Swiss-Prot record:
Uppermost EC category: hydrolase
Alphabetical keyword list: Amino-acid biosynthesis, Hydrolase, Methionine biosynthesis
InterPro entries per record: MTA_SAH_Nsdase, Nucleoside_phosphorylase_d, Nucleoside_phosphorylase_sf
Reaction(s) catalysed (UniProt annotation): S-adenosyl-L-homocysteine + H2O = S-(5-deoxy-D-ribos-5-yl)-L-homocysteine + adenine; S-methyl-5'-thioadenosine + H2O = 5-(methylsulfanyl)-D-ribose + adenine; 5'-deoxyadenosine + H2O = 5-deoxy-D-ribose + adenine
NCBIfam families per the UniProt record, alphabetical: MTA_SAH-Nsdase (TIGR01704), PRK05584.1 (NF004079)
Function: Catalyzes the irreversible cleavage of the glycosidic bond in both 5'-methylthioadenosine (MTA) and S-adenosylhomocysteine (SAH/AdoHcy) to adenine and the corresponding thioribose, 5'-methylthioribose and S-ribosylhomocysteine, respectively. Also cleaves 5'-deoxyadenosine, a toxic by-product of radical S-adenosylmethionine (SAM) enzymes, into 5-deoxyribose and adenine.
Pfam families for the chain: PNP_UDP_1
Active-site residues, Swiss-Prot/TrEMBL: E12 (proton acceptor), D198 (proton donor)
GO cellular component annotations of the record: cytosol
Protein name listed in UniProt: 5'-methylthioadenosine/S-adenosylhomocysteine nucleosidase
EC number: 3.2.2.9
Length: 230
């Protein structure tokens, strides 16, 4: 099984790349793809860059050039669940855009025209992720709705509006739904796994800078453990 792994920033993929064997790097359109093995599993790891357009480009190139059997999106996110702490993990139960609004044409809030309202992760990948939780010691993990938009959320007013639109949202970030949409159109199984770097409030910029390395490391460990269950 060949698995594509996408993270937006260097701290989100550095641990994975450092742990790879037989790594070979190729740069396409300014995006580096590193192919090799992790614990004997064939993987391609890429740092997509931040935001939905960058993530869409990277995912499309990954699928077209490397034909993975599955795609895992790893990295950090802002948290919306009081029982989770910075460093804890959200495994996607579904993924939605939070900054899309074509409701004037009868679509749900967050639903892009001619696309499903939610992108559903692969059940086998989710099951493997849940099995991997035990290897992370005291790190807590839940399944939940992950929402995506091209904004770093740190405004309580905006947070309140988002929760009114998506009351079950567990985490928000800037790439997952774009990756999920590309995987949906290519019929490639996916899952999004995010470690919390902040709590999507006024302190988020400070928290993010302080904890992004920790969040990226936890998410990478989760992915490496997940691979053992595939």
């Amino acid at each position: 099984m060949k698995v594509g792994i996408i993270g937006a920033m260097e701290p989100e993929v550095a641990h994975l790349i450092a742990s790879m064997d037989n790594a070979e790097s190729q740069t396409i359109a300014g995006i580096e793809f590193v192919a090799g093995t992790l614990d004997g599993k064939e993987v391609i790891v890429t740092r997509s860059g931040i935001g939905k357009v960058a993530a869409s480009i990277a995912t499309t190139l990954l699928i077209e050039k490397y034909t993975p059997d599955a795609v895992i999106n790893t990295g950090s996110a802002g948290g919306f669940v009081d029982t989770l702490a910075i460093g804890d993990i959200v495994i996607s139960s579904e993924v939605r855009h939070h900054d899309v609004d074509v409701t004037a044409f009868g679509y749900e809030i967050g639903q892009m025209a001619q696309q499903p309202a939610a992108f559903m992760p692969d059940e086998k990948l989710k099951a493997a992720a849940n099995k991997a939780v035990a290897s992370l010691g005291e790190v807590k993990a839940i399944e939940g709705l992950i929402c995506t938009g091209d904004s770093f959320i740190c405004d309580p007013v905006r947070t309140k509006t988002m929760l009114e639109h998506f009351p079950t949202m567990a985490a928000c970030e800037m790439e997952g739904a774009a990756i999920a949409q590309v995987c949906h159109q290519f019929a490639v199984p996916f899952v999004v796994i995010r470690s919390l770097s902040d709590n999507a409030n006024n302190d988020s910029p400070v928290d993010f800078d302080s904890y992004i390395v920790k969040a990226g490391h936890h998410s990478a460990l989760m992915v490496m453990s997940l691979l053992k269950h595939l």
